[in-house]
Amino acid sequence: MGQTVTTPLSLTLEHWGDVQRIASNQSVEVKKRRRVTFCPAEWPTFDVGWPQDGTFNLDIILQVKSKVFSPGPHGHPDQVPYIVTWEAIAYEPPSWVKPFVSPKLSLSPTAPILPSGPSTQPPPRSALYPALTPSIKPRPSKPQVLSDNGGPLIDLLTEDPPPYGEQGPSSPDGDGDREEATYTSEIPAPSPMVSRLRGKRDPPAADSTTSRAFPLRLGGNGQLQYWPFSSSDLYNWKNNNPSFSEDPGKLTALIESVLTTHQPTWDDCQQLLGTLLTGEEKQRVLLEARKAVRGNDGRPTQLPNEVNSAFPLERPDWDYTTPEGRNHLVLYRQLLLAGLQNAGRSPTNLAKVKGITQGPNESPSAFLERLKEAYRRYTPYDPEDHGQETSVSMSFIWQSAPDIGRKLERLEDLKSKTLRDLVREAEKIFNKRETPEEREERFRRETEENEERRRAEDEQREKERDRRRQREMSKLLATVVTGQRQDRQGGERKRPQLDKDQCAYCKEKGHWAKDCPKKPRGPRGPRPQTSLLTLDD
């Protein structure tokens, strides 16, 4: 009652400050809300075994990382900072994570020295795992392999087997020796699948450049044993990666990983190249690899004997059980990798580099990786070279997304900024972008504001139109009323008033109208008589 279960997700959320510090060391920035979304909702859908509460298992983390870094529409660039941070926590766990991480197993030497003489110690009975040994009836005289003290059982397929007990004293009649021989002869030989499982489980040693997951391994009899590649491995590598012509960088990285982890022989390398490359691509790679052979002076050589000795085209007689043979194989793999890198370079084409632009939802870190890959593929320059940092930085600024590029150009003291500083600033700008929900909400709000403003403007224009009509109608009515008043005043016009000494007839002053000399003086004519009609008329 009252107890809570601690999970990797809840543990990282409780120590979120440390998580942000680890993310900052990886030149990325993470947000708690997105981490809570990706871990339980997004990553379990990748079908790689990711639990909803998270895990610190590096195998599962690397599988999720491969899904996140997938090219094209299948990738998830917005999740890159979060899976990179999670990987860093699992790879170098802080103190609060160590109790929840399974302890790393001690690794055996990758290139063991073969025994030169008879050993005084009794050889181990088998190099197999207990799960693969046949069921043998235990003998009371022999100590048990697993203790009965109630301790936790190991994973029989993925963990190293426990040490066998010391050999008891042999019986005088030699029966014990015969039983020992029978016990050893009944154990089957190691299988390739067991080596693959153990190779995937055990990480490489920090101070070694080789891995335990190679086809050459030390068997139970003290001899190196060889298992070739499985057909399923070759099939998956070919179908889950682009061709060499389409993306030489990615396929080169895959082959480099295989050469490092599996330590293949000369025949394995030919099988690998024949599966992943076309005939023309393979010939080009072999030619470039032979060009990379160096002589005793450290410079490239064209002497046929030295070239054929270091990188033969026909099957050599290298014995991988001897140090000399293993050294030949190491040099051959290094030259093969150099040939892949040189053959993957295309003719110089800066237009291809300028055509690499940041996608709308692509993180700056993923965009920088694509930009560097374009430099490696289409130019003779190494983007990791310090002398090319300025060119890569300028391309990163100019070819970033418009909103990120504008803000990067306005940074203070831009000339002193390193490429890492620019990526850090770009990540901050990228993470401050709106989420799709916030962007939709902003668009909806802006649409409503525009509609409201448009309605207000329409109402204002309508009111202005009404006022203009009213003014025009007022002017028209005023004109009509004024005209009517003038007409009415014109019909009732009175005679002008006369002065006291002014004539009403001639309008001259000094006399009146009866004395006006201009007025005619003749007798008046008789007035016409008005006749009245009677009823008889």
UniProtKB/Swiss-Prot annotation:
GO cellular component terms listed in the entry, alphabetical order: host cell plasma membrane; host multivesicular body; membrane; viral nucleocapsid
Post-translational events: RNA-binding phosphoprotein p12 is phosphorylated on serine residues.
Motif (PPXY motif): 161-164
GO molecular function, a single term: zinc ion binding
Lipid-attached positions, N-myristoyl glycine: G2
GO biological process, one term: viral budding via host ESCRT complex
Coiled-coil regions, chain positions: 437-477
Region (Disordered), start-end ranges: 112-217, 433-537
Gene3D superfamilies per record: Gamma-retroviral matrix domain, Human Immunodeficiency Virus Type 1 Capsid Protein, Zinc finger, CCHC-type
Keywords: Capsid protein, Coiled coil, Host cell membrane, Host cytoplasm, Host endosome, Host membrane, Host-virus interaction, Lipoprotein, Membrane, Metal-binding, Myristate, Phosphoprotein, RNA-binding, Ubl conjugation, Viral budding, Viral budding via the host ESCRT complexes, Viral matrix protein, Viral nucleoprotein, Viral release from host cell, Virion, Zinc, Zinc-finger
Name used for this protein in its record: Gag polyprotein
Protein species of origin: Radiation murine leukemia virus
Lineage, top ranks: Viruses, Riboviria, Pararnavirae, Artverviricota, Revtraviricetes
